[in-house]
Amino acid sequence: MKKISRRKFIQASALTGIVGGIAATGVYKVTEFSSNAEGRIVIIGGGAAGLSMAALLQRWLKKPNITIIDPSDKQFYQPGFTLVASGVYKPKDVWKQQEKCIPNKAKWIKDSVITLNPERKNIRTKNNGEIEYDFLVLTPGIQINWDLVEGITHRTLGEGNAHSIYDFEGAQKTWSAIQNFSKTGGKAIFTDTYTKHKCGGAPKKICLLTDDYMRKQKTRDSGVLDFYTVDPILYDVPHYTPRLEQIYEERNVDITLNTRVKGIDTKHKKVYLERNWSNNENDVTEIVEDYDFLHFTPPMSAPDFVKESGLSWQEGGLAAEGWVEVDKETLIHPRYPNIICLGDCAGIPTSKTSAAIRKQVPIAAKNLILTMENKEPTEKYNGYAACPIITDYGHVLLCEFDYNKNPQPSFPFSIMDMSKEQYAAWQLKTKVLKPLYFHGMINGYGF
């Protein structure tokens, strides 16, 4: 029998514990509660949050009446886009046909929402007219505003070697670009964006994966890698920040803070940036950088129909992009208690990740049913989110935290120092989370 090191044994044991713990938790969650509550439930959005809510509600309600409105043909595992863009996954690994993912007791209207009127409890769709509801689950996801970066559109993504993994085709193009850049060398620029966006760690991941891929190809010396962030710090969760900054320094990747992308000249391969050190709009320095390979993050917001519905925050830091106003603990709208919102569209001060949704779903489902029963919602969400920052092919810095940016380890990793990157977390990211998504989470298990 082949011997394994104590370190590998501990990590393998932790990984086994993750799978077992998730399975046990999922079974317990979906069998502990049932209700006779009735009402027309409409779910806008059939992504991670929408399908998971539908699946769990149909298990918990004895007489479910659930309609899902979503236009998509495919169900994407979006956290896998980074792994497509780095060659770990094949494109076919991260999607399934949507019709095979819709819960069997839910009605699917394959359409887009045009307007939403919470006063009339009414939704107008593009092709199916008006739909009324008693209770609304608002999970439409996020709107990517490619047009807010001058000089490039969704259609022209990839031209001038300017790429983004926030798109399925874009992730595939990014992988080709990384391989080519490793051969040619030059200057690579990676950026985030000034709005809240899906998985804030993704731009950091693809930067570090590009670096590691080049090292494995023995071509790293031929390239210069620079990372630009709009924030005054590389990462805003203190428990994990020191090691992440150290990794960038060790890899010789320069970090520029307080800087955002304004536009891209794909013909001449120039990126136009604005640096603002003081948060004063009059104290802005414009910068132009040449590049050979660019990965940028487009601005994002709530969908237009949400912004026009009156459900968004009207003031504060979450108002600018139209994020839905909800109680950050119960996830219920303060002015319309028959509306609950979770996922990327929710205006809550935490990261927009699949892991956050996984924790929000059982809380939102229970509180919605309590509302249907004319009871006060009692379940509370603590802001848990997780961002597995891939630092190289084989290690992940698993960042788990709450609203207060305190560490919130939910997996059996306490025997390791999770302020540093770990092999077991890489196994979790690449081997466990995708099956958990397709076979557990969107089927109402594994919360």
Model-predicted regions and their roles:
Residues 345-375, 379-381:
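A conserved FAD-binding loop/helix module that cradles the flavin
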